[in-house]
A protein has these predicted regions:
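Gly/Gly-Pro- and Ser/Thr-rich, intrinsically disordered tail segments characteristic of DNA damage-repair
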Residues: 1-282
């Protein structure tokens, strides 16, 4: 009897800390410019989160506070130029207001981190997961991310993995106002990569939810040539540099290298020489 194909779901809470801070202020993180950072630690402090609205201006999620200040100044200089050089008549943190009135300067809220609050919200969301999946099938990866093995639940609920993930995400949104993204795969790696890379580049469904799926075959078709390679789970700049030094720039390159025959330059042994036992993360 063939082994059952397993279904894994990864769920990531979108800009979690920033979304919680917006929720506490009855604001929408999709339209509110907000960063989570402690300005008393100097402007070199790293922002724990940036709201999706502010990210849309090109500000990365883990920027230093001085980078946010600099980018906002650049944006306002450009807004003033497009407004004929006139002085601003006001300022706003809301993207709708900023689009409607060019005489407003872009502003943002700086929220001091409140870890106890984030843990409380994360626990509330974990309890939503428990409505659908037993704790032994949930792996908490971080405060805002989980993996779930949903294989044994699909027949019970008479749902596909996509339908179950969508139902869970919609309940999170309804109960906590926190948006989430999901990846689905036949193993943990594929569901994580589906969430991290593919879901970010697809249009949301009619409920505003992004869910991406990968199989071994679709992974090869969609992502073997994807760059930068650092977008992939567990491939940091150090790994990417070592791979580039031997002419490997994509996951397709790595896969072909791992299939090389003994005695050839590109083979599994090359990866083990470069990374030791950690080569197993790539092969």
């Amino acid at each position: 009897m063939p082994e059952q194909t397993r279904s894994y779901v990864a769920i990531d809470l979108k800009s979690f800390y920033a979304s919680v801070e917006c929720k506490e202020r009855n604001l929408d993180p999709l339209t509110t410019n907000l960063v989570v950072a402690d300005p008393e630690r100097t402007t070199k402090t790293i922002c724990l989160a940036v709201s999706p609205a502010l990210k849309a201006y090109g500000i990365p999620g883990r920027a230093r506070l001085f980078e946010v200040v600099r980018k906002v100044k650049e944006i306002n200089d450009e807004r003033k130029r497009k407004n004929g050089g006139h002085e601003f008549t006001g300022q706003s943190c809301d993207t709708g207001e900023l689009k409607a009135d060019r005489s407003f300067a872009l502003d943002y809220i700086t929220a001091v981190p409140r870890m106890a609050l984030y843990m409380k919200c994360s626990t509330e969301i974990y309890n939503i997961y428990l409505k659908y999946v037993a704790p032994e099938d949930i792996h908490v990866y971080s405060i805002d991310e989980v993996f779930m093995d949903v294989t044994d639940y699909l027949n019970t609920y008479r749902m596909t993995a996509r339908e179950l993930a969508g139902k869970i995400i919609r309940e999170i949104q309804q109960e906590t106002s926190i948006a989430a993204t999901a990846g689905i795969g036949t193993n943990l790696y594929l569901c994580k990569v589906a969430m991290d890379i593919v879901a970010k580049h697809i249009e949301p469904d009619q409920n505003g939810v992004r869910i991406a799926e990968l199989t071994e075959i679709s992974y090869r078709k969609l992502l073997w040539a994807h760059q930068p390679i650092t977008d992939f789970w567990r491939v940091g700049p150090g790994y990417a540099k070592k791979l580039a030094e031997v002419g490997l720039f994509t996951m397709g390159d790595v896969a072909r290298c791992s299939l090389g025959k003994p005695g050839e330059y590109y083979n599994e042994d090359l990866l083990y020489r470069l990374f030791g036992v950690n080569a197993e993360l790539l092969i």
